Amino acid sequence: TFGNGNLMSFGHYKNLIGFNGDIITGNINNSDDIKLLQKYNFDFIFHHAAISDTRVYDQEIIMKTNVNSFYKLLEFAKQKKSNLVYASSAATYGSLPPPQTVGKELPENPYGYSKYAMDQLAAKYSMENPNLGIVGLRFFNVYGPREFYKGSTSSLVIQLGHQILDGKAPRLFEGSNKILRDFIYIDDVVRANVMACKAKKNGTYNVGTGTARSFQDIADILQKELNTDFGTEYFINPFSGYQMHTQADISSSIDCLGFEPKISLEQGIKSYIPEIKRLHGSDAK
């Protein structure tokens, strides 16, 4: 459980309750902490420790944490002859029109660029080490249990769910029926990670549903599941250049990973409702 080296870490011990493996806590920016792993041998390394908040604009911190530390982990995987699955991001696409396709990237913030740089570094290592499995997964809009500790960066699903449980109308940007995202449930994301272990070839792959749904859809489905009819409160979108439409091209994910999403937005939210209710008003933070 390696933190990302700054105060934007979203890890929490409660997400580890019930885990029976060895737990070593460290900072991926610290080479001495990485050395703590030397006594272990790994078949696969899942690298999900990094800055994941797109609103962090300190370029030096982001590049050191996301890219420099990734280089250390690639060297570690090479030494251990371990296959590596790591988290890339749909932020590498910026505001390119849908469907977003691997090989067509235009990052528009330091976070997106750091993930793009990681993908380039992974490709270089793949060419130089053809027997080493290295797969990057570009996650789109993930939602589901165990994200609560991300606070304000948690998914729209849990944030709107708690607004509704507070007895309030969900608050959305004006025109939210036309703001589209590729929302994918965490269970599908976990499956994608597992299937990446047996990828036909190294590379970077999109992890989304291939279908875009609106912010308004989220609010409407939640109200249906929670048996409420509060309507929706709209406010002006304060962000200029706001991304209006993300939708993953998952053709290569199907071909090379065998990954196809199984859970629709309606099914995912329905499954998530008990957790949303349990956490409502909780001091679990």
Predicted regions and their residues:
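N-terminal Rossmann-like NAD(P)+-binding domain of SDR-like oxidoreductases, especially those catalyzing
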Residues: 1-140
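NAD(P)-dependent short-chain dehydrogenase/reductase
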Residues: 110, 123-180, 186-191, 197, ...
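Short, contiguous clusters of charged residues that form electrostatic/catalytic patches at enzyme active sites
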Residues: 68-72, 116, 120, 158, ...
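C-terminal substrate-binding subdomain of Rossmann-fold SDR/epimerase-dehydratase oxidoreductases
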Residues: 165-285
